[in-house]
Amino acid sequence: MVERELDIYWTTLIRFESQLLEPEMWDMAHKSGCRSLYYGLESANERIIKLLKKDTDIEAAKINLEQAKRVGIWSHVMCFYGFPSETEEEAEDTRRFLLENQHRIPSVEMYFFVLYKNAPVMYQADEYKIDVKVNPEHDLALDYYYTPESGQTTEDAMSRYERFYQEDFGPWALRINAREHVFLYITKFGTSDLPQLYVKNNPEAHDHNLTPEAMI
């Protein structure tokens, strides 16, 4: 794209990569038109990462986020609480990662684990030690209720998710679900204006030391 001088902007879903550590790689990504990245972190706890069958390296994730910030690429990090057998302490690892790296993370999306129909976990219930509640009357259901043998219950994860937005979410500029809209905005105005707009539209943010500098 750079060689052909296409002059286009792009965004993508991505996972944190140990192969994306060199500054030159990030310089080239921005030069090619990358303006935002949507990371599926899911969890920052090593045991849960392995259960998810991901190879996320947390230290590499920090470098990815720092390099993206340096070149002007917006990073949106997606996580959830309540993967089967996850304990309160393991969930806290994810919360701690987000809070400690808030200066590198422009926006965050937190949720709780949902057992979707046809998801790999659905077919490995014994391995993940969950009891899936399949109601024959709900044949069009897209997800199922389940109970784990250990760890947080679904209700525990939902409560923790709600507390995150009530108690921890303040330092972030926006809760972004309309990613295409944000992408279009960033391509025109850059990454720094969104936090400023948040403070402008939410004057009470200053009461919590939520300056634009703290949120980007």
Regions found by a protein language model. Give the residues of each.
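Soluble or luminal CAZymes and related metallo-dependent hydrolases
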Residues: 21, 60, 86-93, 152-160
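Catalytic cores of alpha/beta
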Residues: 24-27, 84-100
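Flexible glycine/acidic-rich beta-alpha junction loops that bind and position SAM and/or redox cofactors
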Residues: 47, 51-52, 81-89, 101, ...
